[in-house]
């Protein structure tokens, strides 16, 4: 399929740790802006539950986040969810710059009532996703959102941010709780990994 993405460079004199991406294809039109510091979230994808999950990334990830997406939802939500993941990943990669002074690693275990999810992040520069999530059987959709798209979203994010993420769903009965805990745990782990710890690059290779 034809794809075209435009990456916006930060404005002259703009503060670091921010990224902005505009991406338009025959299937979607996506714009993402983020800043790696606490701030407001403005999310609109046409998928209310997905909007709610992206808001969790903003709040628990400690980042100001704007996402505007229009997609061919009459066909399926997959294109929209995946392309938002691509845009978010590219914007995050911009915001991380050369990664000097960052913690690099982040780990979080997040409960939501009966559900418990663990997420681990490494800003390694090598895309990888391990997604161990045996979701509760039966219900597959939450407010029109196909929960299987959660893995597709994370894979797109990982690939384009060039980071390593491990997600382990330890247990959970309520599907909404499990999926929300996945987003919250990933956000908390990202927040820890992107925290500043000094000026040195956290790698013996000299690059990430």
From Swiss-Prot:
- Reported EC number(s) for this entry are 4.2.1.19
| Pfam families listed in its UniProt record | IGPD
Q: Does the keyword Membrane apply?
A: no
Listed CDD domains: IGPD (cd07914)
Q: Which GO terms describe its molecular function?
A: imidazoleglycerol-phosphate dehydratase activity
Q: Record keywords: Cell membrane included? A: no
Q: What is the reaction catalyzed?
A: D-erythro-1-(imidazol-4-yl)glycerol 3-phosphate = 3-(imidazol-4-yl)-2-oxopropyl phosphate + H2O
The protein's annotated pathway: Amino-acid biosynthesis; L-histidine biosynthesis; L-histidine from 5-phospho-alpha-D-ribose 1-diphosphate: step 6/9
Task: Kindly give the Gene3D superfamilies that the UniProt entry links to this protein.
Answer: Imidazole glycerol phosphate dehydratase, domain 1
Disulfide bridges in this chain: none
Q: Which GO terms describe its biological process?
A: L-histidine biosynthetic process
* Signal sequence, start to end: none
Keywords, ordered alphabetically = Amino-acid biosynthesis, Cytoplasm, Histidine biosynthesis, Lyase
Q: Which family does it belong to?
A: Belongs to the imidazoleglycerol-phosphate dehydratase family.
Extract the NCBIfam families matched here: PRK00951.2-1, PRK00951.2-4
> This chain belongs to which protein, by name?
Imidazoleglycerol-phosphate dehydratase
* Gene that this polypeptide is encoded by: hisB
């Amino acid at each position: 399929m034809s794809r075209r993405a435009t990456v916006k460079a930060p404005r002259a004199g703009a503060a670091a740790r921010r990224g902005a991406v505009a991406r338009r294809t025959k299937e979607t039109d996506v714009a993402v802006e983020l800043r790696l510091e606490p701030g407001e979230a403005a999310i609109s994808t046409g998928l209310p539950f997905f909007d709610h999950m992206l808001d969790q990334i903003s709040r628990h990830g400690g980042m100001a986040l704007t996402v505007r997406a229009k997609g061919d939802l009459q066909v399926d939500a997959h294109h929209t969810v995946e392309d938002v993941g691509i845009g978010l990943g590219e914007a995050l990669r911009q915001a991380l710059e050369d990664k000097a002074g960052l913690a690099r690693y982040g780990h979080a275990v997040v409960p939501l009532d009966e559900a418990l999810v663990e997420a681990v992040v490494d800003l390694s520069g090598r895309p990888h996703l391990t997604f161990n999530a045996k979701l509760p059987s039966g219900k597959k959709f939450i407010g029109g959102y196909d929960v299987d798209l959660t893995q597709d979203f994370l894979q797109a994010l990982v690939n384009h941010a060039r980071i390593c993420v491990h997600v382990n769903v330890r247990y959970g009965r309520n599907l909404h709780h499990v999926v929300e805990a996945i987003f919250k745990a990933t956000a908390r782990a990202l927040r820890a990994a992107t925290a500043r710890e000094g000026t040195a690059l956290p790698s013996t290779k000299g690059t990430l």
